[in-house]
Amino acid sequence: MRHQCRVPQLGRPADQRKAMLRGLTTQLIREGRVTTTKARAKALRDEAERMITLAKEGSLASRRRVLGYVYDKQLVHALFEKAPDRYSDRKGGYTRITRTVRRRGDNAEMAIIELV
């Protein structure tokens, strides 16, 4: 039995789920907003907020952790330059999830997740 499961499964094996969340996190940091399903957006929120919090710390260890997660090295350097200035007054809540219309093919709940 899986009591108090904390990780959303998203209908995928663990390796595929981690790769998908890494890709979505990279895209969110690069573009500033991503349109995806509501469940994926909620799972992405945790990862993106963790990366921004690490970028606010600015230490070498946190930079290496983000480099190991985000796919684009130049994007990590840009994140570490702008995140402390952009989010200095916030202690969390760096993203916003807005619900949109359902997807036409399978009627899945869609959402836009964007950086505040």
Curated annotation (Swiss-Prot):
Membrane-crossing residue ranges in chain numbering: none
SUPFAM superfamilies: Prokaryotic ribosomal protein L17
A GO BP annotation: translation
Keyword Ribonucleoprotein in record: yes
One GO MF term attached to the UniProt entry: structural constituent of ribosome
Record-level GO cellular component terms: cytosolic large ribosomal subunit
Keywords associated with the record: Ribonucleoprotein, Ribosomal protein
Subunit structure, as described in the record: Part of the 50S ribosomal subunit. Contacts protein L32.
Family: Belongs to the bacterial ribosomal protein bL17 family.
NCBIfam families reported in the protein's UniProt record: L17
Protein name in the entry: Large ribosomal subunit protein bL17
Gene: rplQ
